[in-house]
Curated annotation (Swiss-Prot):
<feature type="transmembrane region" description="Helical">
    <location>
        <begin position="13"/>
        <end position="29"/>
    </location>
</feature>
<dbReference type="InterPro" id="IPR022920">
    <property type="entry name" value="Disulphide_bond_form_DsbB"/>
</dbReference>
<dbReference type="GO" id="GO:0006457">
    <property type="term" value="P:protein folding"/>
</dbReference>
<keyword id="KW-0997">Cell inner membrane</keyword>
<keyword id="KW-0676">Redox-active center</keyword>
<feature type="topological domain" description="Cytoplasmic">
    <location>
        <begin position="163"/>
        <end position="174"/>
    </location>
</feature>
<dbReference type="InterPro" id="IPR003752">
    <property type="entry name" value="DiS_bond_form_DsbB/BdbC"/>
</dbReference>
<keyword id="KW-0813">Transport</keyword>
<dbReference type="GO" id="GO:0009055">
    <property type="term" value="F:electron transfer activity"/>
</dbReference>
<keyword id="KW-0143">Chaperone</keyword>
<dbReference type="GO" id="GO:0005886">
    <property type="term" value="C:plasma membrane"/>
</dbReference>
<keyword id="KW-0560">Oxidoreductase</keyword>
<feature type="disulfide bond" description="Redox-active">
    <location>
        <begin position="39"/>
        <end position="42"/>
    </location>
</feature>
<keyword id="KW-1015">Disulfide bond</keyword>
<feature type="transmembrane region" description="Helical">
    <location>
        <begin position="144"/>
        <end position="162"/>
    </location>
</feature>
<keyword id="KW-1003">Cell membrane</keyword>
<protein>
    <recommendedName>
        <fullName>Disulfide bond formation protein B</fullName>
    </recommendedName>
</protein>
């Protein structure tokens, strides 16, 4: 059943990287063409997508087993972090706080507060983070981000557990 993972792990990693780039491009389209402004949690999810894209791309490019596993683990961590942030934002959208304030923007928090205070403020969310401005098949952007981050994490985990064994495209060769 999982033979397709064994036969082309490099292609799967490249596909994960390409999917992340496509998601980032779609986010830019929504921001610059449609006019949706990203909230602080959306921006953090974009950084997680960049991390998954870069690390999965590096894992795909590096054929030596130790390196591809290192990059894949880092991509898995970024995907897990992105899934956490997307899940938190989805929670805020489903159960908005009683008093939703707009709060500071992402860069304002980072520039004006020490990182130890800015990070909790970002994850607390803001009034902007609870807004659902766009949906597809009943899911918000945060919901779909969670699904994609989870898919990336599962694929990366399966690749790591199976160790890239298999066919000519395998990552285990030197």
């Amino acid at each position: 059943m999982l033979n397709w993972i064994d036969t082309a792990p490099r292609r799967i990693l490249a596909l994960i990287s390409a999917a992340c780039v496509a998601m980032l491009a779609f986010g830019m389209y929504l921001q610059h063409v449609v006019g949706l402004e990203p909230c602080p949690m959306c921006i953090v999810q974009r950084y997680a997508l960049i991390g998954v894209a870069v690390f999965a791309g590096l894992a795909s490019a590096r054929g030596q087993k130790g390196w591809w596993m290192t990059w894949s683990v880092l991509a898995l961590v970024a995907a897990g972090f992105g899934a956490f942030v997307a899940a938190r934002q989805s929670w805020l959208q489903w159960y908005p706080p009683e008093i939703a304030t707009c709060g500071r923007d992402f860069y304002g928090m980072i520039e004006n507060y020490p990182i130890s205070r800015a990070i909790p403020m970002i994850f607390r969310g803001s009034g902007d983070c609870t807004a659902v401005d766009w949906t597809f098949l009943g899911g918000s952007i945060a919901n779909w981000s969670f699904v994609w981050f989870l898919l990336f994490a599962v694929l990366l985990l399966v690749l790591l557990v199976r160790g890239g064994r298999g066919a000519p495209d395998t990552l285990a060769r030197a």
